[in-house]
Amino acid sequence: MRKHLVRTAVVVVPITFCMLVSYVTLGGQTPAAPKFKYGPDWPKPLPNKWKMGGVTGLAVDKDDNVWVLNRPNDLVSIEVHQEQDPPLADCCVHAPAMIHFDKAGNVIESFDAPQGHGMAVDKQGFIYIGQNTVRKYDPKTGKVLAAIPHIPENANGQPFDNNPRIGWVKGQGGAGPVAGFIAVPNADGGRGGRGGRGGGRAGGGDGAATQAQLQQSAFIAKYPPTTPMIVGGIEEIRTDDAVNEIYVADNAFGGRVMVFSLDKFEFKRGWGAYGHKLSEISTKPEDHAYTPNGPMAKEFVGHLTFNFSNDGLAYAADRTGNRIHVTDKQGNFKLEIKLAEYTGVGGSAGGVMFSNDKDQKLLYISDLTNNHIWFLDRKTGKVLGSMGQMGESGGSFFGVHMEATDSKGNLYTGEVFAGERVQRFVPADSPRGKLLEQLSRVQP
């Protein structure tokens, strides 16, 4: 584990005024960063010659078993040679999109589903997958049981697809999981792709760009941020079973936190950056723009993930905005935590998890660009340390995307780039952690 000199700041919102605080010293006792040991025995090798794609969902159920949502479409042709007729190699085939592992790392069940992003499991064991909306699945059969309402069309004018198909084709691979993040020079010298932060004009010249802007303006006028349905796609899902609610990060308008009833999927409330009411969310592109090390955007920038703590606070991580916004569950703004503001490309503030102590004193933030898990003091937002670096060996990361914790304090991670795997890290002070430390000291 390494400690980093990272500039962090928070915006604290008392009742009557706002204040920017840069942390130098803090009164009271600051919690220490946790220490973990990589567990090489979890998971076990996948059965049936499966090859997992990029991990886009990770959740621990009530029995401490782990559900993994992966993207089979991420595999390239060389990874699915076993699917050719006749097979070209001993391995591999596309794995099912949903894989259920037990505590020992064995696959206990699986089912296929259309490609998605964001996943949750409720106390009854039902699965919720983010696709072009949120769909509820029976984990035993893989059957869709219900879906959160979505507007009847997409931003491009095409009808909304109520029954998306499984996207991969047997024996065929795609461009790979990193392709969308590679910045390709445009004719004007700008750089497109996700890595360019939208910095390149669409092809077809000014006329095509103007037409696209007009189409977008008409779409927003028809479906403004106050729309009580899903407008875009899904980034994150969390269930709050105790109060019969499900939280969804809709990626429209840079990101909206949307809350629905868990049993009937009826809309209840929502908010944007700084706790903006849905009616206050700006649709101006400049209000969603962010440059690394620059001023924070007025609205969410993009790729919003979400979680809530036991004491009723909600944490919305604006990944490409390099920050986390803390509100209560009604959307009242409390705190802005800035994280590794220098980070470009995919941003620094990914998944949000908490330490498993009673007070959940620590935040665990996954960072697919810097390939760290950041450990923050939840009360202040101060960075206490980090774990991981870019690499392909066990315990390293290449695109660490998703994270989850179990009741024992074990930390699970999922990678979306060439890592395309899940890993488990155990607390260093646990019996297993101490044993792993002893084994690491044994000379070959």
Task: Please name every model-derived segment.
Residues 24-40, 87-88, 207-209:
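Blade/loop signatures of beta-propeller domains
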Residues 69-93, 214, 249, 258, ...:
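Short, conserved, GDST-rich strand-edge loop motifs in beta-rich repeat architectures
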